[in-house]
A protein has these predicted regions:
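Short, structured segments at the rim of ligand-binding sites
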Residues: 1-422
Length: 422
């Protein structure tokens, strides 16, 4: 889907959709639990659907129902399964260890850039603990055998998803296990989300220094009903929309959440936006934005929308560092941000691990790609508020990966677009 975005001014209120990251985690632990679970969740994205379908293939019975998701857990382990992860990196990285802990011989398929996204650190540790993989660099990925407990060592600067996958699986094994994480650890808040979810479902994990001790033989105990938090990652786009143009209120976000992307509030405030936090709502109003320095190691998903705020600034230079891992996301996200903003007249340059963006204020119009990347599409849509002309955006359907109703909410806040043929 190609769209024409027109200059606009954002004003209004939206409710945050449920966190995709939280929903992934709740679905997996619910599928491994002792009894059914109802997850209150208002999001039905392509990634969440992929996780639901994969868990059903492993023996769960999960359905989207009014108000959320109904989960009947896996009762009988299946000897074999085919899991279509679509384009979801979270799904394949979380479920590789889970399937191996169940002893299910599994074929993992998928599309988009999923075959290119790294699995080697996780693969090496699983192979060292009894799991047989199909040849390296071959997709689909096939595994055989049941994973055994023991000591696992993972680098912390490639993907926290490897650690999360092991944290889900290791409590199910017969013996005790340890995960040693080699510093530096990036995206640490996502590990904290996993630990919180495990605790809700009765799983004990002890953290000491850079390691996690996981007793074996544990049972997941469902609390019956749980709620997926509001999504700070996707809400960041509309919070930033308020900062660059007008005034936007987002409801349904928890300021005490461990989601790392709530840091968007700190960043926007430091850049000069006016922010009001009240019971149940957050309002961001346009301010006199200026450039700042940002370490993105724990907030890589915010880089596209932070770059939009930086481009809209009236003063100073924004330097983003620690974002090297963006090269292996749904797109080479560093290159995507650079190329698209450059094409729209933004004064931007690349570094080895980030970007340097000089004040631009009003950007130009033009034609850009969405890079089949949901976060790029949403960021460029927000950028239309400070454009001097129309922006033609190709591949806008990529929002379905995480936020299928994005353009409905975009329009409700004053965003202006129409679908075009070319």
């Amino acid at each position: 889907m190609n769209i024409r975005l027109k200059p606009c001014r954002f004003c209004g209120e939206v409710t945050a959709i449920s966190s995709k990251s939280d929903a992934h985690r709740l679905l997996i632990v619910s599928a491994l639990s002792d009894r059914p679970t109802f997850i209150r969740c208002n999001a039905r994205s392509a990634d969440i659907t992929a996780t639901v379908n994969c868990l059903n293939s492993l023996g769960a019975d999960i359905k989207f129902v009014d108000g959320g998701i109904s989960v009947k857990p896996i009762k009988e382990k299946r000897k074999s399964a085919v899991l279509d992860c679509n384009e979801s990196g979270s799904t394949i990285r979380f479920l590789l260890p889970v399937a191996a802990s169940l002893g299910t011989n599994t074929e993992f398929t998928g599309g988009g850039r999923l075959p290119e996204r790294p699995l080697s650190p996780l693969r090496e540790q699983m192979e060292a603990h009894g799991v047989v993989f199909s040849p390296i660099n071959v997709f689909p990925v096939k595994i055989n055998g049941e994973m055994i407990s023991g000591e696992f060592t993972i680098k912390g600067n490639i993907s926290s998803q490897f650690i999360t996958g092991l944290l889900f699986a290791l409590p199910l094994l017969n013996g005790n296990s340890i995960i040693n994480v080699i510093p530096p650890v990036e995206s640490r808040p996502y590990i904290d989300m996993t630990l919180n979810t495990l605790k809700k479902f009765g799983i004990t994990v002890t953290e000491k220094s850079n390691s996690f001790f996981i007793p074996g033989g544990q049972k997941y105990a469902s609390p019956g009903t749980v709620e997926s938090e509001g999504d700070w990652s996707n809400s960041a786009f509309f919070l930033t929309a308020g900062a660059v143009s007008g005034r936007v209120t987002v409801t349904g976000l928890d300021v005490s959440s461990v989601q790392g992307d709530k840091q968007i509030l700190t960043i926007l405030k430091e850049m000069g936006a006016e922010i009001t936090v009240e019971q149940g709502s957050i309002t961001v109003k346009k301010g006199d934005l200026h450039g700042i320095n940002i370490d993105a190691r724990n907030i890589p998903d915010l880089v596209p929308i932070i770059s939009v705020a930086a481009a809209a600034a009236n003063d100073g230079e924004t330097v983003i560092t620690g974002a090297e891992r963006l090269k292996i996301k749904e797109s080479d996200r560093l290159a995507a941000v650079y190329e698209s903003l450059k094409a729209l007249g933004v004064d931007i340059s690349k570094t080895d691990d980030g970007l340097v963006i000089n004040k631009t204020g009003i950007v130009g119009g033009g034609a850009v790609s969405g890079y089949n990347d949901h976060r790029m599409v949403m960021a460029l849509s927000v950028l239309s508020a400070v454009s001097s002309g129309d922006i033609i955006l190709r591949g806008a359907e990529a929002v379905n990966k995480s936020y299928p109703n994005f353009f409905e909410d975009f329009s409700s806040l004053g965003g202006s677009y129409n679908v075009i043929n070319s």
